[in-house]
Amino acid sequence: MACPQLPPLLLLVLVVLLKAGVNYNTPFTDIVTSENSMETSPVSSLISSPFAHSTHSSGEPPKSYSSTMSLETDSITHLSPSSSGATPTIQPSPSSTDSRMIPSSPQPETITHPSSGSPSAELTPSSHSTLPSSESLTPHWSPTSHSPGTEPLTSTDQTLEPPGPAPGDTGPRELHRNPSVVVVVCLLVSLLLIGSVVMAVRFCHRNESKFENLDEVSMGSVNDRLSFAHHLQE
């Protein structure tokens, strides 16, 4: 009795195990699909953002990648059905991988590089163009500041200016006054000398006797004086 009952029990155990395996596989497939959807959403945002930026910068119309994204999600969620309870296998299609690899790396690089390099290319000629303008201005100013035409003007101005004395210097004025002072002093000295000579001559003539002048006196005047002297004596 026990021997013929063993196969049905084994069959029941196998059925239970198969059901448990199917129940175990279903949450695994749900987890895989949720993870794939989470992975595809940032990938789609990253792919759409550089292309949107490139379309704004270059002026080209935006391209839709909904078909490639749908192929990716379909290839990720595609599971091989198995009745024996084996683990599900993910079979991505080659078209989805090709479509994933083509727009991901080369296109953003080719689009972002000109957009980032364009301001530098526009700025560099402007900076180079401003430098020659400043350099071209400097030689125009340098000859005018050191031109030889201005030097004779300064020399003529210096020659036209009178050599007037400084406000604190009194040397030239004294030189102009000294000749007049010398002349006045010489005149005073000469007058004093002449006066002294005249006074000396007069003083010398006072000591002379009056008898030397008798020859010049008339005899009649002498007789009159003598008669008058006789009358006085009597």
From Swiss-Prot:
Extracellular domain ranges by topology: 25-180
Compositionally skewed regions (Polar residues) per UniProt: 41-121, 141-159
Compositional bias annotation for Low complexity: 122-140
Localisation per UniProt entry: Membrane
Single GO cellular component term: membrane
Protein's membrane topology: Single-pass type I membrane protein
Residue stretches spanning the membrane: 181-201
Cytoplasmic compartment segments: 202-234
Region annotation (Disordered) ranges: 41-174
Annotated keywords: Membrane, Signal, Transmembrane, Transmembrane helix
Keyword Transmembrane: yes
Signal peptide boundaries: 1-24
Name recorded for this polypeptide: Protein CIST1
The gene coding this protein: CIST1
